[in-house]
Amino acid sequence: MALKIRLRQQGRRNHVVYRLVLADVESPRDGRYIELLGWYDPHSTVNYQLKSERIFHWLNQGAELTEKAAVLIKQGAPGVYSELMAKKMTRKAVMCQKRRAYRQRRSLKRAETAQAVSK
């Protein structure tokens, strides 16, 4: 079951309000959700309220962000977003080091086989 943090449309005509929810990927936009993580009202002076500790928890559990939800979290809970980006960058750096080490081992092995063939 893949989970996404996304916006769920609420409200009435000409006054749309959004809820930030954790939902299954296959559920419809305004359908069933697992947990309410906050809300966003583009019409009021207090635009949003987010539960940053729950957002961070679900992101650590493997939930993915939609583009609009990422923008809202970056604006409303910058600490959560910066930690998420730092985690992604360290993961990317580790994978890059592993790839580099693998390529070096592979090139050494090819050089050894080329020497063995030339003898």
Swiss-Prot record:
One of its GO terms (biological process) is translation. Keywords: Ribonucleoprotein, Ribosomal protein. Transmembrane segments: none annotated. Coiled coil: none annotated. It comes from the Bacteria. InterPro entries: Ribosomal_bS16, Ribosomal_bS16_dom_sf. PANTHER family: 30S RIBOSOMAL PROTEIN S16, SMALL RIBOSOMAL SUBUNIT PROTEIN BS16M. One of its GO terms (cellular component) is small ribosomal subunit. One of its GO terms (molecular function) is structural constituent of ribosome. NCBIfam families: PRK14522.1, S16. This is Small ribosomal subunit protein bS16. It comes from Chlamydia felis (strain Fe/C-56). The lineage of its organism: Bacteria, Pseudomonadati, Chlamydiota, Chlamydiia, Chlamydiales. Belongs to the bacterial ribosomal protein bS16 family.
